[in-house]
Structure formats: C-alpha cells, structure tokens
Amino acid sequence: MPEKNRVRYGCSSEEIARDFAEQLKYNQDADVYHTTKEGRYEAIAYAIRDRIIHQWDLSRKTQRKNHSKRVYYLSLEFLMGRAMTNNIINLGIEKPVKEALSSLGYTYEELRDTEPDAGLGNGGLGRLAACFMDSLATLELPAYGYGIRYNYGIFRQQIKNGYQVEQPDNWLKDGNPWELKRPDLTYPVFFGGKVTYLRENNRDTYKWVPDEQVNGVAYDTPIVGYGGKTVNTLRLWSANSPDGFSFQEFNSGDYTEAVRKKINAETLSQVLYPNDTLYMGKELRLKQQYFFVSCSLQDIVRRFKRYENYSWKNFPNEAAIQLNDTHPSLAVPELMRILVDNEGLGWDDAWDITVKTMGYTNHTLMPEALEKWPLPMMEKILPRHMQIIYEINRRFLSSAVSYFPMQNDKIAKISIIEESNPKMVRMANLAIIGSHSTNGVAALHSKLLVENMFPEFNLIFPDRFNNKTNGITQRRWLLDANPDLASLITEAIGDKWITSFDEVEKLKAFAEDPSFVEKIGNVKTKAKLKAADFLKKDCGIILDTDTLIDVQVKRIHEYKRQLLNALNIVMVYNRMKNDKAYRESFQPTTYLFGGKAAPGYVNAKLIIKFISSLSAVINSDPQVNKLLHVYFMPDYRVTLAENIIPATNLSEQISTAGTEASGTGNMKFMANGALTIGTLDGANVEMAERVGLDNIFIFGHTEEEIANLSKNYSSIEWINGNPEIKEAIDLIKSGFFNNNEEGIFNPLLSSLIEQNDRYFLMADLALYNKRHDEASTLYKENRAEWNKKSLLNIASSAFFSSDRTIKEYADDIWHIKPCHVKKSKEDTVLEDARKSN
C-alpha cells in the first residue's frame, strides 16, 4: 500500500494507480469498472499532471530567486500535438504508468489514443515553436511561450469526392487536463477610439482613449524538460468580454444584444487564422495579433516590476522577447507605448530598451508572404500604435538617407509604410528596425535574406543579421515516435543522445557492420507495420508494407511542389502502361501524400483533388495496382506524422530552390532513417553537406540557376522538348483523370502553361524522374546498401537537433544562462500553503 501522502507525487506504479483511481472516484464519481474511455484518459492525465505541478512551482521559484533572465517566445502558433506520452517520457515514468494501468485492467495505448491533438498551428512554424519549448526546458533555460488558446485549432480535414472539406476542430470539447486556468492573470486589451494630446512638464503627452475593451485570461500548460527538473510554461490567452451578459437588455427583450459583446470579444480566440479574404477577416486577424501581444507584454512587464527597486534600463537584462515570424511584431510599438505613455520614459531611452529586448525570426523568402496591413485599418483599430509607427519610421528614414543619397527607390523599399493604394504597414520592416537581431532559419535562407530580400537593411544593420538553422527535438521525433529505433541506438551507443544528439554521430562506426545495418532495416519494417495499423484505423488506407514507402507530408502549397510529385507519378504510370519490361522490373512503391490547403487557396485545393483523382485511377487499374499505390492521407497532424515518418523509405523535399526557408519535416525523416530526394533548398543544403551527396538524392536547378533560367523561361519549350512530359500533360488535358468533371484541372494546367510555371516544375521534372528511378533501383537491387545509407542519415542528423538551435539562440541573441532546478524528492504542499499565508 503506498503512503497516503505520496499519492500525488510518488512515481511507483502503485502510487500512480492509486492517484488514477482517486481521480476517477473524487473528480468523476466513478470507479475503475464504471467509467468512459474519455474519463479514464482524463484521470490518468490528471495523475501525471500531479507529478508535474510541484516541480513546475519549484522551477518558477528557483528562476525568480536566482533573478534569471528569461526568454519570452511569442508565436501565433504552437503545434503541440498530444501531451501525455511526451510528458511521461520526459518525467521518466513510462514504465510505472503502463504498469499502473495494466494492474487495473486497462492499456496505456487505449488512453493515449483518446487524447486529441492540440492543433494550435498550421505547419512548420507552430511545430518549430513546440520543439523549441521542449529544448528550452530540457536545457534548463528559463522561458515562457506566449500564444492564443484557440477554441478551434487548425481545421479537421476530410476528403470527400477527392475534395478537401474543412470541419471545425473542437479540440477542447472535453476540456484539456494539461492546462490550468489563471483567472488572477486577466489583462484588459483595448481597440479603437482616439488619441488626445497634452503638453505638460515640458514634454508631449499622448493619451489613448479607446472605445472597445476585451479581457485576456491566461491558461498555463507545463512544458516538462527531459529528466523532469525544469518545467517551463506555455501561457495561452483566451478572450472574453469585461461586460459579460446583460440582464437588462435580456429582460427588455433584446436577447441578441444581451450577449453581443460577449460573443464579439470571444471571437478573438475562437479560430486559428480566420479567412482574411474579406475585410472582417483581416480586421479579426489584426485584432488577434494585438490581443496576444498586449496580454503577453502586460504579463512580462508585471513580472519585471515585481522586483524591488527595478530600473527600466535593466529590462533587456531581465527579458529577451523573440518574435516568431511577423505575427507578433506589434510588440515593437506596444512596448514603446508602455514605456513612453505608461511609464513616462523619453523616446530615446524607450527605443534603446525596445531594440535591445526584441529579436525577430524571419520564416519566408516569398515577398508576397511578408505580412502587410492596410494603414486605414491600423489607424482605426490601433490609433496610438500607428502614431508610434509613424515616428519610428520618420526617425529611421532620416538616418537611412545617408546610406542611400538620392536613391528614393531604396528609401521607399525600407520604409515601414508602403506608398500603395491603400497605404500598407510592412510588418517585417517594423520587426527588423525594432529588433537587435534578425535571423534566418537555414544557411541558404539567411544568405538570400541579406542578398535578395533585405540587402538595404543589411547595409544599415550589418551586425543584426544572422543564421540559426532550425532543428527538431529528438525526444518527440525519435525517442517517442520511434521507440524501436531509439532502443537500437541506445543499445549501440548508450542513451546520452537523448539530451546530447551529437552522440548519434558515433553510429557511423557501425556502417560497415552488416548485422547492425540489417537491424536498421528490421526496425524500418516494424515501423511500417505500425504505420499500416495506424492508417487502417485512422482513415481506412490499406498500406502494403512490402513496398517502398515514398512520403510527401507538409502544407499544400504550389512552391512545395506536390504537383511535381504527382506529375512524376503520371509519367511512371504511363511508362508502366506502355512498357511491359519496365513494369516487370518496377520496384513496388506506395506514394503517400498528406497536408492541408488554406481554405481560400484554390490551386492548393485543386492539387489535393488531382492527387485524389490520380489515386482513384491508379489504385483501380488492375494492370498496375499491385505495383503502384497512391494515397492522400486526410487530416495530417502531429500524431499522423509520428506514425508515418518512422515508416518512410524515401522523403520528398522538392520545393523550388530558393523558396523554402528551412523545413523541419526533412530533419524528422532523416533522423528516422529515411533517404531524402530533394532540391538544394532550405536545410536540404546543410543535410547534403553533412550526410554526403552519395547518401541523398539531390536533383534540380539550384537557386542561382533558377534565377538565370527565369530571365527567358518558357515552360512550353520544356514540355515540348520531352516526349514523356508532353504525354503526361496531354493525358491530364484529355480529361483522363477528371471523373466526369469537365475542365476541373484547367487552372493547374494554366499555371504550368499560360502562366509560365512560376515554380519551374517543367524544368525540374525530367531530372526528378531520373533520380526517382535511381532511388527505386537501389532499393530493389541492393537493400543492404540502402540500409547503410539509412544508418548514415540517422548518424548525420546530429546537427539538426533543436537543442543545438536553442543553444545558439541563447548564446548569440538572448544571452540567457541555464538555471538549475533541483529535483524535488518530497511533498511540501502543507509547508507551501502555510508559507503563502
């Protein structure tokens, strides 16, 4: 029998089982025989959370006592996925949790699979933020993540008749046992109104008189570092109305007006990325961004002012604020507003503090993806901030003129205000000017930022631009997602790799050991069987595990070139139909696609439809369907990725060179032993450097070659110059894949022909097809060599840990140090309660 007072923090299987049973009984009035699956999941989640809470509190107290500088990571997205397995692995209690549940007649897997994904992100941006939070806690670096607690995350994707259908992702419908509501941390956020001017005490004073208020309430989620010592906080803001429900209006019969303010306020945290094709959607997105920035900065300032005798000049020594893309860049004028209007600092002092505090991460090389807001909208919603932006811009441009005398075009380019109709506010320019650091996320990306996108800013601020190549957390993407491979690695080199990923380089020593290389292949086979089981349950796909598994999973976008992959499959299909010898020698292959298209992105949604149509034709063609399979996996999310990535043989990373900032999916596949077929784009360049060109299938035109090609590019010449490409295009034109929907794929054909193929698919397709043939032949004819290359990819992925990335941010940008937190061995709940009174 466990000691009664150890039930909430003891880590034996008995103590966990008792806590689980007590959660059922006292929180749900249930027992182990009469409860639902959801109730059991909630009970075990609360039991695990109990083992986090004390260390979470101790982490905060230790960081406060040590006066540790903290990093505040502001991101509109946090694609966390499921929390339970990650938490028990990082706490080191996986075995006792499973034993506890087994002793009561339940399986851990059943309850694990009940947890919904926390889909508070759209793709790489949000998943990067999640990996960074894991690394920050594991490295014992004091940190808060700040974002929005969306009631509905990224939509749930269904495929109906080949089309993407968006369904609401009501991930909070059963509550979230990992979070704690913090009503004591509620902040007012204001919009609209006017600004009044006053001259007093020999200084200009501005007062914002807003006409709208919402409140932001904090919800905290613990982020457990590996080893369970440091527990940092992800703080998400939920919007509500300060006015609530109006009984007066309700009783007078105006039922709609009685709840209007409440509904309008709560809209701010309802949906991730509302459709902004309409004015109302744009306004809502702008309000969302300011809402989370305002709440976060009020919270940061509150924490800073808690110290006695605080001095604002020390603020950058206490706080580093990192802007994950431009979505939080309103933090620049908001901090200025707080310092100048609320705290009474002079402009120069406030600006010095702001720039020293802020860092900005750029995530795009697409000029049209750089965020801009209509100036009239900004003036209407945030009138005081617009005044501050004007003043920032005026001072900056007056100093920049000396760099570009008589060059009005360059001055116009670096201005925060774009002189269009209507005028626009350029958020990337604001972030660069207002931050002491601007970083790219891969070596090529950072090079192109300073050479192509922002050369003028680099001339003015040469010390501000730097590179921080992205990374992934090996704890989720290898230890958690691929336990068989993790065990094999630990068996070979020990377990230090879990927190020091450089250790996996030691695996290179096993590349000439045939028995170990064979084990790598066996692990991949087991992962395929697991993936097949998952896909059958998740979406009904029957995966042939004896085939080469070729996977492209990522956001659907024309620059990521899912269409290139699909066109290559059409070429392979035609060749199989026309050439018996080719068909008989073909390596059986399954092509898996997954990813979501933005609801308003017509061509991306058509690409999904085309892949689905391709799948329907090929999978039902008896001449080829025992050799060639094509599937679109619906509702791509973290959990699906965790099951598919370990099973992949060939990873598709095929964006047009010079368009992908970095990518992190490429790193996840590499660490799990997939070979990559890819262009020299984003982090693929650094992957190729580390693994060697013999162990990666690089193809296509380089970024420089694309730039030269674009000067007189003609896609139709490339089509007509290759009979197989022309045959594939003609087959699509003929309506062969249309399924009685006449002209359905004309917009895609138009993008390739009439619109001259912006992303150079036709220029790269033959090269891509050739490399595919080489990969297929190697897999078929020399599996041992393939497995050796797989091992070398795992060993060469050492550089791509988010631990390495975060250490670079901490040393070069944030200047923060680890704060070591002792592991609590005893329950001090009563002592803590007495001290608090």
Where are these regions (language model features)?
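A conserved ligand/cofactor-binding region detector
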Residues: 1-837
